[in-house]
Amino acid sequence: MRYGYFDNEHREYVIDRVDVPVSWTNYIGLKDMYGVFNHTAGGYLLYKTPEYHRITRFRPNGVPMDGPGHYVYLRDQDTGDYWSISWQPVGKPKEHFSCRHGLSYIKYHSDYAGIDAEQKLFVAMDDPVEIWDVKLRNDSDKVRHLSVFTYLEFSFHQVDMDNKNFQMSLYATGSRYEDGVIENDLYYEEDGYQFFTSDFTPNGFDSLRDSFIGGYRTERNPLVVEAGVCGGSFEKGGNHCGVLQKVLTLQPGEETRLLFLLGEGGIEAGRKMRQKYTQARADEDFARLLKFWDNKLSCLQVSTPNEGMNTELNIWNLYQSEINVMFSRFTSFIEVGGRTGLGYRDTAQDAMTIPHSNPDKCRGRIIELLRALTKEGYGLHLFEPRWFEPEEKPQSFKSPTVVPTPDKSQIVHGLKGACADDALWLVTAIVQYIRETGDMAFAHQVVTYADGGEGTVYEHMKRILDFSARQVGINGICKGLRADWNDCLNLGGGESAMVSFLHHWALRNFIALAEQLGEMKDAAEYTKIAEHVKEVSESVLWDGKWYIRGITAGNRKIGTQADTEGRVHMESNTWAVLSGVADHEHGISAMDSVDEYLYTPYGLMLNAPCFTTPDDSIGFVTRVYPGLKENGAVFSHPNPWAWCAEAILGRGSRAMKFYNALCPALQNDIIEVRQSEPYSYCQFVVGKDHTAYGRARHPFMTGSSGWAYFAATQYMLGIRPDFDGITVDPCIPADWKEFSVSRKWRGAEYHIHVTNPDAVEKGVKSITMNGRQVRKLPVLPVGTVCDVEVVMG
């Protein structure tokens, strides 16, 4: 069953059946002001931080679902009939409504009672202003008298206080109206103001929620809309909203357009922004937004026989990856802002995967991570970048609602709080950034440590690798410490196969960089460490058919052929190959086991069989319901590791089988099973040991997106940037006859056409660039455009 379709020409997903099983969300904004909204305009807006500067209110996990939002009501003043452009909250017959999710914008459309209407939400490019662009057309054959009402509910800035501490929040906010501008005032803050205004003189307003909604009513049937006239309410204290009314008369066929602006600042800011954001300026900003994404997406475009892959790689996969790099993990309908900051491992992997489209942001994220590294060599698992920025001038008074000033003696946790994998991801992120940009000088940039002192980027990397080399258990395998990548499987602090494999991968990438920098002594020293890690890992972790997951603190191996639960684990087997530890024979056997035990039509399960008996020596994973999340679900993030592993082994058909199973775009016609957005990778898909098998949950905010993009472009399509050129080494299904990739790299553009005359899955017979045979694609002068022909065989 389908609820919509991909409009790739306009880079939009069109929801033409709006009663989707769960909210289908999207993001607006690119910088400090951003928000998340669903297909019916439910959602919230914030400024800089989802915890301390919420602008509009949201009630998560509620009934009716996912509201309030940023709504526009239309009322026929002659009949009293009213509806909302976004279908909800009024909920007229669904056949009259649709939604288009675009890249950082959303369009809601209604065609009801002879009135064609559109509400477009996006954020201005240069100012913290959300623009509601509303267009109306009278498609009936008679004159129509209409009223337009907006509705948003302002939030107390601090999200926990807004949801729990009403004795404070209800008496610390006020509202007023002047000259067509509603001002929301958070009195506890010096600059705690928001405005809501329009590009016309309103016929009425309300800024008290309860006056607008009325007693014993909801957003579905607000009293003011039902009555057709605003009450002009405002007050100090209470719950506040943004309601502006416009009375219109439309002749048959007549169109009109209205702008509404929600932004940071008080009445004066509202006046200024209203003057600035005319309809022409709104059009200009929207055109700039489209151009912004044009530039991003043009960095890499593909044409393959797989339309689902084309849709993902050319539009939605990169878009989702960019959202994660920009906004991290704590702004969604699942993570609603009660905790904020950067997760170390997630941020490092995000930055690793898309430096080609967002080098400045990836570089910035890498520096933030370097500053959150201790001299011991471990990273702070969850941190706020501002903790390590230059001291700001303290505010003139202490407020319980603003972002607190950190106690720097308390923010650096000890080894007990360290996750063994966190900082290892950063090593490869740095190397990938340098391979992409050619910025070798970055390795010598001096950056501070979280616990004092400073060192170069290169020195930070050495501390990370040395830390992992020291933190080994009695079997010589890296300790898992608080946890490795799988937070729920920490083996009681035992030894982690995944961390040892990840250590080897990081070492290999570091050695390549050291050689480029001329640090040959370091290259030799760390090569010896890598060889030792490989030797110990092979001797301890190989179990005859696959690699074990780890060893508990009590020295019990987990993930062996003798186990009845948790026998085969995806992380250890994929990383044995991806890291370069496994030889070809062991790699084939390990990945055959992954296919045999973990494959489902919806992706690869994290482990099998599921754990059913609690065992705290293994970890909390044994207390997770079978088939959910870390216990036997199709956990999306590590799935691309399997695509990489199969590509390394030369099995393109197997890699594509795994890719297709997880690909959201290829599940567009089974929404009765998937339920969630078909344009977004989700955190997990419910596994086969659960009654909801195949159901996807937690969209957008997941590292699976960046890894899916990285694995598909660099390992499956095989376009890999290196220090001195681009390697082209595809691994594809044998029945692919050809594919093309357009890749921008260091200011040049490479049009790569790959043919497969011998129907192989891996192997390159020849590479020709502008008629000349080459081994890899060289760095070219900025502005160069070249044609590349690659023949597999």
Task: Describe every region a protein language model picked out.
Residues 1-346, 359-372, 398-405, 432-436, ...:
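Anionic coordination/interaction segments
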Residues 768-772:
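Short strand-turn-strand beta-turns centered on an Asx-Gly dipeptide
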Residues 332-340, 382-418, 450-456, 477-496, ...:
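Carbohydrate-binding/catalytic loop surfaces
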Residues 272-278, 288, 312, 358-371, ...:
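Extended, well-ordered alpha-helical scaffold segments
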Residues 342-347, 351-476, 497-504, 632-655, ...:
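Aromatic-rich carbohydrate-recognition surfaces in CAZymes
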Residues 778-793:
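C-terminal beta-strand-rich structural cap/linker in extracellular carbohydrate-active enzymes
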Residues 149-151, 166, 380-382, 502-618, ...:
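Catalytic cores of carbohydrate-active enzymes
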Residues 721-754:
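Surface beta-strand/loop "capping" patches
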